[in-house]
Amino acid sequence: MFDEEDSSRKSHEEIRKTPIFKKGWQIFKLADKIAELVKEEEEYEHLQEMERNLLLHQAEQLRGDAMMICPKISGAMGGELYDLKMENAALIRKSAREVQTGCSGLELWGFKHPEYLELLRDEVEEFRLLFAEWIKTFDVWNYTIDRWGLFNPPGINYDDKDPDDDLPFDPDNFPI
């Protein structure tokens, strides 16, 4: 029924092989290891309970932000509409920037392995370059009007008339 439509969509395996997904996965794995280090390290036992909790929270937040990147890449690659791709791209960018901020937070709360944070920052910078090139591939003319006005292609406004509104549609004559 939807074979023609589905043939243009990338499979999960195809998505996982893309450079941007691979880099997003590397970011997650590194953030996950950092969070585990904070959880397991005995060297944080000397911290007061509140400081330790802040460090643990910051590490879990870092992991959570990194965890959002790959699913949103899949979401953007799984569809063709510009506005939905851009919505996912904005969430990816936000998550990647939060990972960068999270590295600073971990330093602030006393994370003992700054070399891992530097590695993570380097991964995010490499990801940023891949991301900037990737979003250039989005087809700006394959869109629906975003009535919120946030993810429309250049020159399209939230209150523009949708040309699809002029297409005749008879719900009683719709094949099921």
Segments (PLM) and residue ranges:
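Amphipathic alpha-helical assembly/interaction segments
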Residues: 1-176
